[in-house]
Amino acid sequence: MTAQQEFFMALRSALKEQGHDVYDSVLPPEHTPYPFIYLAGSWNNPQDIKTGDIGKLTQIVQVWGTAKMRGTISGMCEAVLATAKTIKETDTYAYHIRANETEQQILNDDTTNTPLMQGYTSLRVAYSRR
């Protein structure tokens, strides 16, 4: 399994264990209650070196809620980052969150009849094969 997939699975599992509603692959059904977490896209920048595989990956995490939930969304974004920092290793890889390369944004979304807000976290993670 790739470093990207192992991190994704570890993050999803950890967020669900904390009691968050977490979705991936497809957005949740239309009447899903807010707030919820959506594990969106990810990408990998591997490097091959003599001593093993290393690289950096990026995982996008979105927190969706109504416009009145801005504080909750902000707190959940911080919880996502804190949770990601606890993922130190999986069966195959060791991980380190690159906090100085991680970005968080709170964005308005007016594509529905209900004004929404999206917390957008771009986690940047260094990894190496154990």
Residue ranges of each PLM-predicted region?
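Short hydrophobic/aromatic patches at helix-to-coil boundaries
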Residues: A3-Q4, A126-R130
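Short beta-turn/strand-loop junction motif enriched in small, turn-promoting residues
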Residues: N44-P46, T66, D109
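Oligomerization/assembly interface segments of phage tail-like spikes and tubes
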Residues: D53-A67, M117-Y127
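Short, polar/acidic, helix-capping and beta-turn segments at strand->helix junctions
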Residues: H31-Y34, P46-K50, I54-L57, N113-P115, ...
